[in-house]
């Protein structure tokens, strides 16, 4: 069998070996597969320190090393998530004898993609992506001499460190530029996107696990839990046979729908299509979770993302896009992070229309009074323009005023 990791043999044989062994163990020895995949992440992190002559952190743990490389600007948030995912699953495999063929299939393509990024950043800058092919189920590894295997891995790791230490020093600005370019061009599957979304949701307080917290596995809204339930059924006829990628529940209240897409998709168009259709098509048996209706919608908030951090230059193909369905004139907007369960409840409780009404009716007496701020007409016009931007739902506004015209007072 040709390994997906063969492209590493010349420049990084240690990574090629770990990847090939992980593929061979995938179905016959999942525990060993996950350990090999974890070693890919650990080896890449250690080699990055050596190639770039970066001092290891004082608290020289795996977490601290990954975090330092992130602070140095060498790792994007999606790569950090993959490295931590590989680290965590390896720890479970080592310390709990954990095994899961489903996790093998999740992490194998992600480890391959990570290796492609590493090749493009620390090896051949002109390397071109090759699609990952999942090993066939009849791939079985024969009798393995574990002692000989460990000896080979140790020798290859030592060789890799020697090669990294002897490599020409690349200017840090050039390395960061190449690392960013390779990360930005790295293809992501919907499975990886889901993995990244799970991580991001957990960080802000949601219980999220696409593989286990699924409707088909019996997960249901539960009092006291903030659940992101994967593959939630609706009556929609569009998309994934009517299954929303995630339904968000604060306790037993249905507050949001998430649609996850591959990186090449235009995200706002997903909001307008599946993102709006799923909230229209909530099943009758799920109406007990509906907190209100807004026209044809039975869910207040809808989201779409591809797991990619928000980039202004790739505005419609990055970030988390959000639409508040409670008002028909609301437009989709890009967020830089997920809303927490508390944040959603606060937004639901906020009387935005009432506050906008108060803002419109607020007197300008203090602003115009000679004993007050005594603002000039152009300053009042600037304030009115800013208020209009707020009332219309804009997230940003820019006031341009010349030097000496009272910007601070305005």
Predicted regions and their residues:
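ATP-dependent helicase/translocase motor core
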Residues: 120-410
